[in-house]
Amino acid sequence: MGKYNLILSEYLSFIYNSQSAVQIPIYYSSNSELESRCIEFHSKCLENSKNGLSLKKLFIEYNDVIENATLLSILSYSYDKYNAVERKLVKYARGKPLEADLTVNELDYENNKITSELFPTAGEYTDSLMDPAILTSLSSNLNAVMFWLERHENDTAEKLKIYKRRLDLFTIVASTVNKYGVPRHNAKYRYEYDVMKDKPYYLVTWANSSIEMLMSVFSHEDYLIARELIVLSYSNRSTLAKLVSSPMSILVALVDINGTFITNEELELEFSNKYVRAIVPDQTFDELKQMLNNMRKAGLVDIPKMIQDWLTDCSIEKFPLMAKIYSWSFHVGFRKQKMLDAALDQLKTEYTEDVDDEMYREYTMLIRDEVIKMLEEPVKHDDHLLQDSELAGLLSMSSASNGESRQLKFGRKTIFSTKKNMHVMDDMANGRYTPGIIPPVNVDRPIPLGRRDVPGRRTRIIFILPYEYFIAQHAVVEKMLIYAKHTREYAEFYSQSNQLLSYGDVTRFLSNNAMVLYTDVSQWDSSQHNTQPFRKGIIMGLDILANMTNDARVIQTLNLYKQTQINLMDSYVQIPDGNVIKKIQYGAVASGEKQTKAANSIANLALIKTVLSRISNKYSFATKIIRVDGDDNYAVLQFNTEVTKQMVQDVSNDVRETYARMNAKVKALVSTVGIEIAKRYIAGGKIFFRAGINLLNNEKRGQSTQWDQAAVLYSNYIVNRLRGFETDREFIMTKIMQMTSVAITGSLRLFPSERVLTTNSTFKVFDSEDFIIEYGTTDDEVYIQRAFMSLSGQRSGIADEIAASTTFKNYVSKLSEQLLFSKNNIVSRGIALTEKAKLNSYAPISLEKRRAQISALLTMLQKPVTFKSSKITINDILRDIKPFFTISEAHLPIQYQKFMPTLPENVQYIIQCIGSRTYQIEDDGSKSAISRLISKYSVYKPSIEELYKVISLHENEIQLYLISLGIPKIDADTYVGSKIYSQDKYRILESYVYNLLSINYGCYQLFDFNSPDLEKLIRIPFKGKIPAVTFILHLYAKLEVINYAIKNGSWISLFCNYPKSEMIKLWKKMWNITPLRSPYTNANFFQD
């Protein structure tokens, strides 16, 4: 337990190393006698430090506290405002500072010039192109590195090598930063003009990325990659990541498959010892050589050499180094361009008339037919979702920006806001709400833009459309997605699958007479050529669908949808350029519509089908699979003869030629053994994921707190680690210390202990052991959890005032009236709460809640409230179960081959013993009969929490609940009187518990929980028919066994003798479990 607390204490003495600095530990205990000693200890410490006395005697006198109580937090005093960073940095700044080459980047502002050269005056300055957008500072990052270096300067052997590598890299960063001085951040963690004017513009974001990279160096190869990227990314802010990661699309085609996993009929991964040779035409090698030459031209030396060396034998054993380079390239940080350049990028493409009209016609028709296929059933049956599409849209309206700031009145309060949900309420109150009229987005009302920044690609623009577009599209898109959910071609949406399933699908059909064609169509999605055929295909489909029904409301829904497409064919955008706002006619498709993902998938499927139908005129093959996944599509083609180099070359050139006939600037490749798409890549029959999540730079600023960001940082670290990019854990923990500390006054700071940050309470930030989610069951853990729960629900005056206004109340009751057929408090309260929660995205409200949260936390961290919350958490349930289990040693042999080489050893071991799973465990209740019954008659979608509440009510209350949602009385009666209802009780409880235990997150999502190998380690005699209890006992046992194996690399077996008398008690408790939302769970959710 003590690792974090130990580092915390060392970190504090490192930061506050002056005479005046004091650290006062604060302890607590659930034992009341010990607790009073804790309080005594704390007050004496305060007393002594006020009088400047040493605390050493107290530590001896109160040894019982230190030994037996739990550390709650550390209070630290320091009177010198520290310019400590600068002082410490000098020690490391012994190298030659980097000089930026100011000619590397095409766009002037992407060169790392001194800020005042890019922005001559403060008025012209913007930090938007280099804002790290994270609530931690460069000085903190430097401190964290220097702390690590100081801690490890006496390391020996292998550890010493790591120390030297990192020291060497840090010398580069320190020397460069020191040359200009450490940029000081303001209260919002932004870097202002007067701080930056005499410094290179990209200094901060470069230094953050460099620190992230150097703290991820372990081996010599890591060191070479990092050094090269750190040095070159100082100058090259535009193309470096792209150059370094480009070769991967070809590398995956070079490795022979010798044994792989394939998907079998049951959709499970099954080992196949097939051998498939990589057939690579010379042309491919020429393209690869060209890529390596481009890298060398950009000044890269070691990285192209590593790739070159690997090419001698192209072995899968050494491939992880290629995967490593590919992942590392993303850690140079985000490429952030000016909005004008991002928008013009798509408009620069030459528009030619010289295209194959026949292909375009086929493409449009395929889109039309797919739209019809997706919507035919719901339209013919006058689906209620299409009838009440407006209500459905309002219920799921987001609280994102509506594109303009308006003055809104809520009761006596007048506020300015851009939020969609607030605009809808305001419009309704003032009779301006007209969902039947889709506002134009032409030259008179150009679309405001958002942005999407990503490493290694150009900035993309996002439409911020008026909320009418969302309402018009929502219901129809939901129906499209339901269709996509049971259509395997749509890899991204396919029901409950995960990426392992898609992996097995590809490898399944690879053989000596097959080839796989994979295309990155991101350029096509945003090209002007796509927009007319794309929108027209959708419009034609909608026209045909409108003739399949006589229901006026369904026709109206389809017509409004059609109108959004017509309007967007003539779209203008507004782009701020300096102080002017430019209006530009924008003839391409941009994200921002509700339909973006669904429609792009349809279009990409149509595109690859069009291309394949052309190719099939010339070759004879069977298409074994076609898949589309976001911006990528791929297909496996089976020929009747063995594939030769010449064939691969010919097919490849014909495919490219075919795309060119449509003027589609896409990257199309053909291989016999592997593919590379944005989400994953397959090489040598194994699956890899890009570990490219940036830790110390963020894409954009949201309204998350430092605590939230600390949790996201940890969560990102875990995802990277599972994907093969490991950052030093001590460094991550140091960052968490910095980001979770709370300032009381200028010289007084409070640092929460590991117990506070890892107990699953509303404040949880990380796990004390990577990959293992612990649910504390000791007295002290449960005590602190209870104490935190008593602090829940921070109020916001502004939110309460808005919620009390007639505008808000009328809106909520309007929704309830339209939705409900009779009174239903659960649903009405739910809607009101959801709407109130949406207000959180309005900054003043989230600020107010944050302040309340922090002051509550401060009280708490100095002395836990003795208030006992009576709520039951999952911890209580597990605590009741634990005593009845007995542990014995066990042995499981490794029986599966590795197929995900980047996994950490301990996680890999578990998969090799018990196997993996290719599906997501259902944790939202959507498969239950009651959920299906509701969606059959109503547009309302109850959450798993609500279903869990409802299903445990009395039968007549469940009937009333159903009837109020418009379910016919006969169906409600049948449901409650049937067996299905009791099955549902069990099913929903199961889903709810899975949800609470985060079974689909972290590394748990990789394990097969129903593995017979795992089952045989668990023995629970069957007593009485309470399936829910049996379920929780088994699940607890499985988690215990797996957690033990992750931690110790060996297996245990569990025997449980659960008394029958306790079962009913436990069962009753299980219907009152309170869910806990924390920064940690939000971060998990955010990964999704």
Swiss-Prot record:
Metal-binding in keyword set: no
Presence of keyword Magnesium: yes
Keywords, ordered alphabetically: Magnesium, Nucleotide-binding, Nucleotidyltransferase, RNA-binding, RNA-directed RNA polymerase, Transferase, Viral RNA replication, Virion
One GO cellular component, as annotated: virion component
Coiled-coil portions: none
EC number: 2.7.7.48
Listed Gene3D superfamilies: 1.10.357.80, 1.20.120.1390, 3.30.230.140, 3.30.70.2480, Viral RNA-directed RNA polymerase, 4-helical domain
GO MF terms held by the record: nucleotide binding; RNA binding; RNA-directed RNA polymerase activity
Boundaries of every RdRp catalytic domain copy: 501-687
Family: Belongs to the reoviridae RNA-directed RNA polymerase family.
Function: RNA-directed RNA polymerase that is involved in both transcription and genome replication. Together with VP3 capping enzyme, forms an enzyme complex positioned near the channels situated at each of the five-fold vertices of the core. Following infection, the outermost layer of the virus is lost, leaving a double-layered particle (DLP) made up of the core and VP6 shell. VP1 then catalyzes the transcription of fully conservative plus-strand genomic RNAs that are extruded through the DLP's channels into the cytoplasm where they function as mRNAs for translation of viral proteins.
Protein name: RNA-directed RNA polymerase
Taxonomic lineage from the root: Viruses, Riboviria, Orthornavirae, Duplornaviricota, Resentoviricetes
